[in-house]
Amino acid sequence: FIAQEAPANPEYNYIAIDIKNEMLVLAKRKLEAAYAEQQLPLDNVRVMIDNIMYLRECFAETDRLDRIYINFCNPWPRGKHKKRRLTHPRQLVQYRMLLDGEIWFKTDDDELFEESLEYFPEAGFRITTMTRDLHSEPTLRYFETEHEHMFDEMGKKIKFLIAEPDPSVPEESLRELLQYSEKYSERKR
């Protein structure tokens, strides 16, 4: 995904984050090949190994993100593990503190998607675009990921949404969720 998105938009900067080093090594190789093929300098994307739970620690308070892509993340289906989801309200509020734009979320997992439809409003987002069959929506511009291609060939429908911060959500409720999120993060470190 990043090897398609970043060279197509050289005016934007990208950060690819994953907790697995193997994924980032593969992404880096694909980035280098894509930029070499297009004879572009690889100067608008960085790869970083880290736990996304600590994303806010990677940026200054004044740094802002225009868009966050969450593509085919671990669905953590077991009840006690759901709080590890990248779309759990505790995590979404972390993103919200850095975000001036949108979150684009894609998955093949029905349960994760349906529960995420509830998570986003809980974390102070409003869903502006949503489909349970992305490939039947020709008006949506996106780059297909390898997982997406694989799942599509298996006949699985790709679910997709775009969410943005909801300005009508009181800051106090976001602060409470953020405090809970930070308290949990400190215990896990």
Q: What is the predicted role of each segment?
A:
Residues 1-11:
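Conserved SAM-binding loop of SAM-dependent methyltransferases across substrates and taxa
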Residues 20:
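Conserved SAM/SAH-binding beta-strand->alpha-helix loop
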Residues 23, 112:
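Conserved short alpha-helix immediately C-terminal to the canonical SAM/SAH-binding motif I
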Residues 28-67:
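S-adenosyl-L-methionine
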Residues 53, 59-86:
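A short SAM/SAH-binding and catalytic strip from SAM-dependent methyltransferases
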Residues 85-104:
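A short glycine-rich, Lys/Arg-flanked "PGG" loop and its adjoining helix->strand segment in the class I
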Residues 90-93, 114-135:
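Conserved Class I S-adenosyl-L-methionine
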Residues 128-189:
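SAM/dcSAM-binding transferase cores
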